[in-house]
Amino acid sequence: MAITWKQFERYWYLFSLAVIIASLPFSKLGLSIGQMMMAGGWIVERFDWRRLIASLHERLTLRSVLNSVPLSFFLLFNGIVTGFKQFAKNRPALIFSSIFLFHILGLFFTTDFDYAFKDLRTKFPILLLPLLLSTSEAIDRKSFYRYMFLFVLAVLVRSGYNTWMISIHHFVDIREVSHNVSHIIFSLLLTLSIYSLLFFIFNRGLLLLWQKGLMLLILTWFIIYIITSQSFTGLSVTLITMLVLIPVLIFKTRNRLMKTILILGILVIITGLFLSLRSFVRNYYHVNPVDFTKLDQKTSRGNPYIHNVASTQTENGNYLWIYIQWDEMRGAWQKRSRISFDSLNKKNETVAFTIVRYLTSKGWRKDADAIERLKPEEVDAIEKGIANYIFRDEFSIRGRIYEFLWGFDNYRETGNPTGSTLMQRFEFWKASVGIISENWITGVGTGDMNLAFKAQYEKMHTKLSPDQRWRSHNQFLSIFIGFGLFGFLWFLFSLCYPPFVLHRFDDYFFLVFLIISVSSMLAGDTIETQTGVSFFAIFYSLFLFTRKEKDPIFHQDI
């Protein structure tokens, strides 16, 4: 069956949108191609072909063909202007895309224009995607669901690929499996997929029973993947989204039984989290008693131990700096590993210190006998920089909490946050506040953020390793640093005004997306990478500007 040109343009737009959504878990190139396809279709759709053809039909000569060239450029320019006029009438989309405008205005306060223009290229989807989606014909609910199924399928395929890669490769950091798409962004995609599946499973009449069973299997797999891939970000954002969403559901539902179940559910979750956390912290700070007056002075091989009884550092309740025999450990380690005892492990941390921590975590003495007792997989773990046997577990909440507490105690004693992800973030935030205090009105501009952080770290005399002196790892602080107080307030307004005026705060998909996005922005620079900004811009625009109908959190009969 033949299709009209208008239908082809529509199909091209829908296909381009599918390419963008399907590329999110896989490819930056796919994202770029999808956006270029959509932009090209958007321009062609507004090009006045009839006027161009009419000018050629009047008199088809070489001169008329040559004259059609400037006419084509005029029609191309006119079509783009027409599209922007449409865009200007859509105030919510225009205000959201104004986030990009602030990055342009930030050029007035910039000295590093190379980085500034790179940042503008990265952030361009914040302008492009709202422009293209808000000025195109909206999609109906059925088509929207198909796009969400496509998204879930893409995340499912990528999670399967990642699992296969994990099984055949030995990653120093398992998060490297998502190297072409940040593991943090992929965890956000996972979380959005999980809550999309929950919507389809619990929405009555939407799917057949066997289809819901299939969705439940995929949901179960995503949860298993989060655990096996050690995606602490994915688990945290999923949990935070639940803790925010449940009170909203409690407020929205008029069903007393449902309200009671939800209240009991959130109380159980919060109580369980509190008790678990308290137990982990107590266990971490529990110290196995030692009589320092009765410490053995020599190893089984007759070499003297070193005992630093003044140090209170522990690992799993065992004192770190007693029963140390460096020469024995060095000699025994060289027989077990190709990495030198006095060099750095694969995390660029001292091998000797990692060995001491690992052996202490098991309650062993630090001598040749202990090194010889290590299993080959434990030697491999130490080479990778794993300093506690608990951290070898595929996923360990206790290990993550111990890692944080260790970093906190070490930071408190030495002032050096290097090696602890959370303590490093505190140092990033401390530097961010310092920069803001000196540039709170205008900010440092679009391109000077790296220079500002470099100067601030020097000013603070930070003990952070030079290769770990990163930016704020908080999107709100990054905006404040770049554009000052007014830019920060406008950023918040740009996020909140569109859903407010469009009455979408009670839309399930947008609310879930907003919670996920804000959660990620509190602990990361979500829109500072191509995949991050594309995730943010495409779903914000899809949920607000592209759908004809919204999906309320609760139907009227619930």
Tell what function each PLM region has:
Residues 12-20, 94-97, 214, 218, ...:
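Loop-to-helix entry and N-terminal half of a specific, functionally important transmembrane alpha helix
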Residues 13, 28-39, 116-119, 233-235, ...:
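Short, aromatic-rich membrane-interface segments at the entry and exit
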Residues 36-46, 242-243, 494, 510-518, ...:
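Transmembrane alpha-helices of multi-pass inner-membrane enzymes
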Residues 100-108, 128-130, 139-172, 180-359, ...:
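Alpha-helical transmembrane segments of multi-pass inner-membrane proteins
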Residues 16-25, 37-122, 149-162, 517:
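N-terminal hydrophobic segments of proteins, predominantly signal-anchor/transmembrane helices
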